[in-house]
Amino acid sequence: MTIETMNDETEKSSSTEAIVLALVAILVAVFMVKFGLQTLTWVEGKTWAAQSPWLNTVPQPLPAPPAVAAGPQLKAFDFEINAPWPGTPKPNPSETNVAFRYDTGQTLVFFDPGAQVDTLRSIQNGNPAEFQKFTNIFAGKPIDSNYALYRDVYGAAPSQISPIMNGSDAMRMNVLLLWKLSFGFDLRTDTGFYSFDWPNIHGFQFGDPAKGVPVALRAFDDRGHQFRFILTTSPDSTTKITQDDINKLLLTIQPVPFIDR
């Protein structure tokens, strides 16, 4: 093979490599234009999940329980519920909650609904530019209540992000995950994390009572009220909290009639 032939082959090889590299660069550029946001969101999600593995936890739905019969009630902050346990508890009020303590060892902490943060209203009444961004990001799937906000936030997980997903969905997921990091959980979710969407009451349960752990509840009624409860037992108590106890409480939350206030 002559030197001229070798040079010609080298030039052809170099030209082919240059064309291939150019095509790759074009494909990468097209991908980044079309999927750059999604890819960045996907990478961020993986990074956040590695640092905070609980981000991958989403609530498991609880089935709707049967109706609850009328029974003894507990009252606090102009609301009432059916007492989850028999007996006459000793109320221990504080500025933000009332703790009902039973002689059998159970305690129900009822937090003041009026002291709960109205997150959605804070967003709506905040910086107009930020609210406009919020409206634009969630235009396809509007959030119209605090329950809907928590439902979407707690239901988001990095595993739901894909580099080839819709761009607006990627932006929405990015915001939801940032909020999830900010909101955190009321109790550790490795003991159970559940959601309920029943007539008149909706929300989340942190903890499985069958595991003998405290249970926290964050609930929302159809009138915009927010409720938080903690159910626990003293270390020396042999009495257990059951899911029926929790259901009884949730299904009977209602305002105290004005005549009884």
Predicted regions and their residues:
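N-terminal targeting sequences that direct proteins away from the cytosol to non-cytosolic compartments
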Residues: T2-I123, R223, I230-R261
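Detector for Asparagine
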Residues: N7, N56, N82, N92, ...
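Alpha-helical structural elements
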Residues: L37, V43, A49, G105, ...
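Glycine-centered secondary-structure boundary/capping sites
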Residues: D78, G105, N125-P128, K180, ...
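Solvent-exposed, non-transmembrane segments of extracytoplasmic/periplasmic domains
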Residues: K90-N166
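Signature of long, low-cysteine stretches enriched in small and polar/charged residues
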Residues: N136-R223
